[in-house]
């Protein structure tokens, strides 16, 4: 069944492939200019003189995962890393800047590149990169793209987005999209989970468990009978890039209700004094490597920078499969 797309704004650039867009009965067929088969398929065309330079720049060869937010009709998406199984590999600064010229070479992240958009683990639209830049607010320099988004109508209110290149994710089908909102029982369950973990890790009790909860999400993983929850609790700290107060810690908990009541499925306790500030916030889930198992993407807030972390399932339990950290204490672990 053909899906009806909602064009959030006028499309200003042509897609790299042929596509149809319809408004009020008017059908526009967008066709690309004629290129060689290598270019039209999205493959890199490398002359012999440039082959060695590309290799020396460390241009990414694996699929790249992007994450970002939509504001109105446009979105800004930042590179998280290269997909490496259920983990991710950071794109190094050396892979972005040419030592010879000082210019940035972004490899697969180029103007006019087409990206498949995801939210809540399902495909919801696309975006064509109109601008490419570098974001220096993270631990390492990160390629960033911006452009106009096209979303399915039921996802018209989505703000948080994850993206993969059309060449990687173009074959993934559209699935029904549902936005999940946490309810009273789930909020109470998150407090119970935190209350269970705090004494087990020897953490100081906050003055109020309720007030220490700074973030909570409900989400539905494929194949699970009930929604899962993820929540972040903070003591003597805030979910921004700012140095913490003495005695600060963060506690991230996830719970599932497969048995009828919520139980801990993953927890991450981090004492800022010994490990450095690293406050996790749930962003979204997606099967980024297409193996049929979902991964979870987290945004991390440090004292001065942002970074990402990822969770994956291993032997039916969640593990931290990736962390790109600014903090030297975490790098050495």
Across the structure, where does each feature detected by a protein language model lie?
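Bacterial N-terminal signal peptides
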Residues: 7-15
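Solvent-exposed N-terminal domain segments of exported/luminal and surface proteins
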Residues: 70-190
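Structural motif
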Residues: 239-253, 304-310
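Acidic/hydrophobic-patterned starts of short beta strands in beta-sheet-rich repeat architectures
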Residues: 222-234, 290-300
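Beta-propeller blade termini
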Residues: 213-227, 280-288
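Surface-exposed loop/turn elements that mediate protein-protein interactions on large endomembrane-trafficking
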Residues: 253-273, 312-320
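Bacterial signal peptide processing site
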Residues: 19-21
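Repeat-based blade/solenoid architectures
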Residues: 199-216, 270-282, 327-333
């Amino acid at each position: 069944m053909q899906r009806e797309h909602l064009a959030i704004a006028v499309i200003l650039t042509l897609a790299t492939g042929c596509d149809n867009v319809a408004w009020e009965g008017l059908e526009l067929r967008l066709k690309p200019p004629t290129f060689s088969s290598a270019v039209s398929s999205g493959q890199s065309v490398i002359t012999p003189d440039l082959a060695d330079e590309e290799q020396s720049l460390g241009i990414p060869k694996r699929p790249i995962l992007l994450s970002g937010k939509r504001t109105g009709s446009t979105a800004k998406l930042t590179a998280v890393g290269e997909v490496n199984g259920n983990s991710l590999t950071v794109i190094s600064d050396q892979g972005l800047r040419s030592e010879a010229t000082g210019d940035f070479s972004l490899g697969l992240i180029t103007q006019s590149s087409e990206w498949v958009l995801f939210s809540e683990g399902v495909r919801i639209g696309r975006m064509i990169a109109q601008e490419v830049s570098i974001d220096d607010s993270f631990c390492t320099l990160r390629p960033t793209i911006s452009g106009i988004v096209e979303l399915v109508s039921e996802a018209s209110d989505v703000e948080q987005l994850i993206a993969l290149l059309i060449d990687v994710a173009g074959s993934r089908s559209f699935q029904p999209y549902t936005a999940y909102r946490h309810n009273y029982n789930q909020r109470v369950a998150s407090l119970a989970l935190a209350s269970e973990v705090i004494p087990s890790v020897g953490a100081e009790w906050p003055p109020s468990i309720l007030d220490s909860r700074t973030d909570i999400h409900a989400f539905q993983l494929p194949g699970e009978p009930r929604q899962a929850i993820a929540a972040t609790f903070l003591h003597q700290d805030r979910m921004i890039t700012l140095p913490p107060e003495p005695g600060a810690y963060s506690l991230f908990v996830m719970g599932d209700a497969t048995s009828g009541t919520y139980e801990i499925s993953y927890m991450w306790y981090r004492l800022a004094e010994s490990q450095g500030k690293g406050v996790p916030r749930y962003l979204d889930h997606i099967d980024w490597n297409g193996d049929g198992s979902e991964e979870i993407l987290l945004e991390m807030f440090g004292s001065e920078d942002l970074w990402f972390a990822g969770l994956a399932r291993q032997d039916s339990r969640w593990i931290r499969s990736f962390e790109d950290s600014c903090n030297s204490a975490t790098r050495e672990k």
